[in-house]
A protein has these predicted regions:
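Cleavable N-terminal signal peptides
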Residues: 9, 19-20
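N-terminal signal peptide c-region/cleavage motif recognized by signal peptidases
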Residues: 15-17
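Short hydrophobic alpha-helices and adjacent helix-cap/hinge residues
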Residues: 20-348
Length: 348
């Protein structure tokens, strides 16, 4: 079911601060489309930050919120139509002055549209990766699907993307990190789960690994393997393999895995060197990695929204990459005999 929320209803429903009672204008409505129900914590936190900042800056435009209510990857063939239905509704009534997409699934569904409202209306995005995949036709088997990775900075010139805050995953820096510590590495095992985010990240890693023909890429794919099957494969990985963890929430059974399953994966092969590209496994399994600095982007998007719609110059912020940094688990590194001198070499 697709939910539609007006700003006043939304603020009351999920406990946001009291709404503006005066000087709200319906001219140039802002349409926010989320991947999940707005009561989901990650969505709620970003919406709350957006509302607070937009109000603080003096924004007075009516904000309408729609949820695509996305769930498992197996229903991805439905997302394009859900997005089309939302956009058609506004195209028939009053087209918004700005569309904001929050979440990977909403963003992918939007850039998979060919309608005039999708391509011409100014758009912003948040809670998304700089690299994505365009949704397939209904007939595609999602378990076997091997999509091309697309880059928001290069591949969508026919869309009116005026701003966004995107996470950039850096395969090169993680390969360099692995080689600093394990110069004899010959294989990289990449772990991804049965989600759109996992598939999108896998497509990007496959694309980037073409730069390293001397390294064999092994895919531990939650679309085709259960937790137990992935665990068994990890158990038998050889000592010339480094693991790069992407995402791990849902396996092929479409059941959400518990947080402690990464502990069990660790215990399946305790001496296996593991790194992370997205912070998954830090604190108990991964030695470290180069990852985005995750944070709520609602405030920044509100600022970009106000500047674009209400600022004196109508300025476009452009798509902004969220910074990344190196993160390490010093305790795990000591357990593997990797000392601080090696750390300094990496960061120099």
């Amino acid at each position: 079911m697709i939910y539609r929320f007006l700003l006043l209803v939304m603020l009351i429903t999920v406990g946001f601060p009291r709404p503006l009672k005066a000087e709200v204008t319906t001219d140039g409505t802002i349409l926010i489309i989320t991947s999940y129900n707005p009561e989901t914590r990650s969505i709620s936190d970003n919406l709350s930050a957006f509302m607070d900042e937009y109000k603080l800056r003096g924004g007075k435009r009516l904000i309408t919120i729609e949820s695509m209510n996305c769930k498992n990857l197996s229903e991805a063939h439905l997302w394009k139509e859900r997005m089309a239905s939302i956009l058609e509704k506004y195209e028939r009534t009053a087209a918004p002055s700005l569309i904001i997409l929050l979440g990977q699934e909403a963003w992918a569904s939007f850039i998979s549209q060919n309608s005039e409202i999708a391509k011409k209306t100014p758009a912003m995005c948040g809670m998304v990766s700089a690299n994505t995949v365009v949704l397939p036709e209904d007939s595609v088997d999602l378990v076997k699907w091997s999509p091309d990775s697309k880059d928001i900075f290069k591949d969508f010139p026919d869309y009116n993307i005026v701003s966004g805050y995107v996470y950039q995953y850096n395969v090169d820096k993680n390969i360099e990190l692995m080689r600093r510590f394990y110069p004899n590495m010959k294989k990289v095992a990449f772990i991804s789960d049965n989600t759109y985010g996992g598939l999108s990240m896998q497509a990007f890693v496959k694309k980037e690994m073409k730069k390293y023909p001397e390294l064999e890429l092994m895919l531990l794919d939650g679309r085709t393997s259960s937790f137990l099957e992935v665990s068994e494969r990890i158990r038998h990985l050889s000592n010339d393999v480094c693991v790069l963890v992407g995402t791990w929430r849902i396996d092929c059974t479409e059941n959400y895995v518990m947080g402690n399953t990464t502990y069990m994966l660790r215990d399946a092969n305790p001496t296996l060197p593991v790194f992370t590209i997205a912070s998954v496994g830090l604190g108990h399994w991964a030695l470290g990695g180069y990852t985005p600095v995750y944070h709520k982007v609602g405030k920044e998007i509100a600022g970009a929204t106000y500047n674009f719609l209400d600022g004196e110059t109508g300025s476009e912020t452009g798509v902004v990459p969220v910074p990344g940094n190196y993160v390490f688990d010093v305790k795990r590194m000591h357990q593997f005999g990797l000392d601080s001198i090696n750390l300094l070499k990496v960061l120099s």
